């Protein structure tokens, strides 16, 4: 892929999005970045302050609830990386009754804008592993392993699940199915279903996923509940470093032989294993027993698609935890001792 190419990144001011824009600019790409509101100084300032932003970054205002707004940002781009997703339903919007309808309509509109542009050849959609639960459809237990063939059975109720995550799981699952239905129909579609991401951040606050990842260290009951929800949904916890997440997106963007669905995580482990690692490597951090629950579950990680195409993860569990902990301390969030 020509490094002079233009790449559109939706949801560019988010946790993954900001790192992705930074790396794309570093590699010489011109980036069309969308934000919900160009009137937010912190988000605009973050992106405008990146190296090479002055010459190769163009910002566009676009909301997932206003689909036509993305067309201008997509025009003249060769690739679109679609990270933007509605986390909470806009109650002022009467066109969609929930986040699932908005997310599905959003990816459909993005694809249609890509096709109308006549310049976009590839769409990389940032999915989530919450759409790939290895639970049996009847809720009787888990399959032996999780891979790209797994789809979360939306007819089931999930342990530790509240209304927010019920809606999130449904919206990510339905939106991913929708975007993949366009693969090979005038555009190459890659859905990169990422695990829980940790590491560093460019934002001025701890990203939600990182806060969840280190919730055992900080004794944060609310975020630990989310961690356990993901473990009960997926069998174990798939995690990866932010730098690996960014590299995987660019790898899928630049590799013309990749399309379809790909799961993305460097580690797949029990939450009890995370606690055990922390207690071994950071003996000064005491984790309360209520944050250590061993499921004894042995669900395997069966996805090798990304590695078989030549991708290599560079960050292991030790580095993910180390960088997440360092970032949290920098933000003033210190583990309970």
Task: Give names to the regions the model predicted.
Residues 2-31:
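N-terminal Rossmann NAD(P)H-binding glycine-rich loop of SDR-like oxidoreductase domains
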Residues 38-105, 117:
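NAD(P)H-binding glycine-rich loop region in Rossmannoid oxidoreductase-like domains
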Residues 127-128, 175-201:
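Conserved beta-loop-beta element that borders a ligand/cofactor-binding pocket
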Residues 185-187, 199-214, 252-262:
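Glycine/proline-rich active-site loop of Rossmann-fold NAD(P)-dependent oxidoreductases
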Residues 216-262:
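Alpha-helical substrate-binding/gating segment
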Residues 242, 292-312:
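Conserved C-terminal active-site "lid" loop/helix of NAD(P)H-dependent oxidoreductases
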Residues 246-296, 300, 325-328, 332-337:
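Mid/C-terminal beta-alpha module of Rossmann-like enzyme folds, strongest
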């Amino acid at each position: 892929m020509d490094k002079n190419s233009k790449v559109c990144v939706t949801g560019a001011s988010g946790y993954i999005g900001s790192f992705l824009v930074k790396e794309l600019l570093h590699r010489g790409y011109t980036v069309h970045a969308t934000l919900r509101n160009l009137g937010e100084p912190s988000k605009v300032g973050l992106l405008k302050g990146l190296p090479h932003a002055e010459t190769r970054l163009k910002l566009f205002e676009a909301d997932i609830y206003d689909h036509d707004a993305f067309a201008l940002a997509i025009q003249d781009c060769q690739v679109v990386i679609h990270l933007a997703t509605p986390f909470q339903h806009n109650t002022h919007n009467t066109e969609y009754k929930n986040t699932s309808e908005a997310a599905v309509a959003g990816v459909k509109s993005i694809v249609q804008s890509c096709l109308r542009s006549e310049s976009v050849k590839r769409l990389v959609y940032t999915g989530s592993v919450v759409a790939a639960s290895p639970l049996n459809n009847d809720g009787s237990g888990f399959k032996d392993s999780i891979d790209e063939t797994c789809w979360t059975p939306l007819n089931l109720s999930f342990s530790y699940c509240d209304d927010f995550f019920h809606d999130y799981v449904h919206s990510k699952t339905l939106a991913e199915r929708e975007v993949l239905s366009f693969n090979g129909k005038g555009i190459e579609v890659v859905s990169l279903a990422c695990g829980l991401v940790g590491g560093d951040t460019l934002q001025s606050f701890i990203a939600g996923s990182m806060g969840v990842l280190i919730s055992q260290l900080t004794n944060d009951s609310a975020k630990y509940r989310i961690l356990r929800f993901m473990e009960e949904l997926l069998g174990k916890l798939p995690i990866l470093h932010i730098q690996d997440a960014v590299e995987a997106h660019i790898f899928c963007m630049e590799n013309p032989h990749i399309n379809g669905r790909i799961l993305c995580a460097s580690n797949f482990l029990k939450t009890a294993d995370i606690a055990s690692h922390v207690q071994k490597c950071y003996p000064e951090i005491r984790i309360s027993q209520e944050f250590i629950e061993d499921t004894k579950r042995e669900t395997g990680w069966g996805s090798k698609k990304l590695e078989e195409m030549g991708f290599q993860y560079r960050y292991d569990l030790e580095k993910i935890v180390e960088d997440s902990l360092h970032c949290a301390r920098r933000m003033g969030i210190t583990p309970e001792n």
